[in-house]
A protein has these predicted regions:
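Class I SAM-dependent methyltransferase SAM/SAH-binding core
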Residues: 42, 49-95
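SAM-dependent methyltransferase
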Residues: 139-213
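Residues lining the SAM
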Residues: 108-110
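A short acidic, Gly/Pro-enriched loop at the edge of an enzyme's catalytic core
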Residues: 97-104
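C-terminal lobe and adjacent flexible extensions of AdoMet/dcAdoMet transferase-like proteins
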Residues: 202-258
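A short His-aromatic
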Residues: 113-115
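Conserved class I S-adenosyl-L-methionine
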Residues: 1-37
């Protein structure tokens, strides 16, 4: 079954503990350090548009790209509510096309972990590089092998919420470094009845050195990386370690002339 179909309806409710505000503060702080205080910014793998909205409200001219029409419908509902002028495009990040270049590209909340092959991840990096202004920034996070193998691998989570209940089963493939998670959702409809929906998602963990290598092979310049769980604007950048579950990377376009 397609990813983020029924899940899109309840995604924000299930992800309510994700620290989007803190992540946005860190991203905005970094961009301002590089004198990117406004202008065109792409949210790649934007999902339901939470990060896109936060950056738009901070004064950036936002474009959001996502593969799921259902998730983009949720993003557009937020856009209608906020009044922010955001362009949403339904595209695969492995072959996305834009109308021009961006001052920065952001990609957060595990979006790149859906890329299961190294050559495809490199292709995403190459496309990002192509659509960055000279000296533009690429800010992204990615979950590690350690997180899938040692923290959530083979874990089952079940919860009841106001409008839905879910069972989230994880199955980790050591050979491929791929985590399969099967979602069984029970979503309350307008009649008060619960409809059962099932989805299967696959995410791959990546090691720090491999991601750094692919950044450089794509033509981007690696700037720095740090533990992605400490992402508030004023928090200390914690170095990457073997226990890091999420790594935040900063890369930069470094070959185009102004």
């Amino acid at each position: 079954m397609d990813e983020y179909t029924g899940f899109a309806e309840v995604y924000d409710e299930l992800m309510e503990d994700v620290p989007y505000k803190e992540w946005s503060e860190r991203i905005i702080s970094i961009m301002r350090d590089y004198d990117i205080k406004d202008g065109l910014v792409l949210d790649l793998g934007c999902g339901s548009g939470t990060m896109t909205e936060l950056l738009a409200s901070a004064g950036y001219d936002m474009t959001g790209v996502d593969l799921s029409p259902e998730m983009l419908e949720q993003a557009k509902l937020k856009k209608e509510s906020s009044g922010n002028d955001i362009l949403y495009l339904c595209q695969d990040m492995r072959d996305f096309e834009l109308y021009g270049t961006m001052r920065a590209v952001v990609c957060v909340c595990d979006s790149l972990n859906y890329i299961l092959e190294e050559n495809e991840l490199k292709r995403v990096f190459e496309l990002v590089n192509n659509y960055l202004d000279p000296g533009g920034l690429f800010l992204f996070d990615i979950n590690t092998v350690h997180k899938y193998r040692d923290v959530i691998g083979d874990m089952t989570i079940a919860e009841n919420r106001d409008d839905c209940s879910f069972i989230w089963e994880n199955f980790y493939d050591e050979d491929k470094a791929v985590n399969e998670y099967d979602l069984t959702l029970f979503i309350r409809n307008e009649n008060g009845l619960y409809e059962k929906q099932e989805e299967t998602h696959f995410q791959r963990g990546y090691e720090y050195e491999k991601v750094k290598q692919l950044i450089e092979e794509s033509g981007l310049g690696f700037v720095e990386a740090f533990d992605g769980e400490e992402t508030g604007a004023l928090s200390e950048k914690v170095p990457v370690s073997k226990d890091s579950e999420r790594i935040f990377f900063i890369a930069r376009e470094c070959t185009k002339k102004v």
